[in-house]
Regions:
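FNR/FR-type flavoprotein reductase catalytic core
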Residues: 76-196
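Ferredoxin-reductase
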Residues: 2-88
Length: 196
């Protein structure tokens, strides 16, 4: 319990550069980690002058009390966020917010599709789908192999991983992969998150 005038800062425990403009932070946030579910997000503010930035919870560890966020540096707020390092703190972190993804053990074969930074939101969904006993096929893509994020992590939690290269607009990169799967009667659900 905090007294009047006291505040909590959220410490960055780890900073990982996934690509020159894509970063992953592990944040100390035990209350959020305890309640987080796949599909939810947080809103953060780096400092008192910063704007509020919504980011998907890309991973969480209830025992360690941590959450991971993955973001692309594309504007002033994410540039300031990217300038922080392990040991630094974020002023405000609110969450988990949003409706959790409906995940049940009776869903059968589930296809999780992520493009670009959109791989981050599907990771906790695919992991939980697998943990409860579903068959998980992951299709992931990026403009080139250097910016393909979380490939090793997705391979550990998926029954099958299909990696594609996206040279054109987002729908084109997955069209061939989905069309080969769409007539498969054993597939019961598709999750698609694309950010390029």
């Amino acid at each position: 319990n905090l007294g009047k005038g006291e505040s909590v800062m959220f410490k960055i425990l780890n900073k990982k550069v996934l690509h020159e403009n894509i970063l992953q932070f592990t944040l100390e946030a035990p209350l959020i980690a305890r309640k987080a579910e796949p599909g939810q997000f947080v809103v953060l503010r780096v400092n008192e002058y910063g704007e509020r930035v919504p980011l998907t919870i890309a991973d969480f560890d209830r025992e360690k009390g941590t959450i991971d966020i993955i973001f692309m540096v594309i504007g002033a707020s994410t540039t300031v966020l990217a300038s922080l390092n392990a040991g630094d703190s974020i002023l405000d972190l609110v969450g988990p917010l949003g409706k959790k993804t409906d995940i049940r053990p009776d869903m059968g074969t589930v296809v999780c599709i992520g493009g670009g930074i959109g791989v981050a939101p599907i990771y906790p969904i695919a992991r939980k789908m697998k943990q409860v006993g579903n068959h998980v096929i992951t299709i992931m893509g990026a403009k080139n192999k250097d910016i393909l994020i979380l490939k090793d992590e997705m391979e550990k939690i998926s029954d099958e991983v299909i990696v594609t290269k996206c040279e054109r607009k987002a729908p084109k990169f997955i069209y061939g992969d989905i069309s080969s799967l769409k007539n498969n009667d054993s597939i019961s659900l598709f999750f698609i998150v694309l950010y390029f």
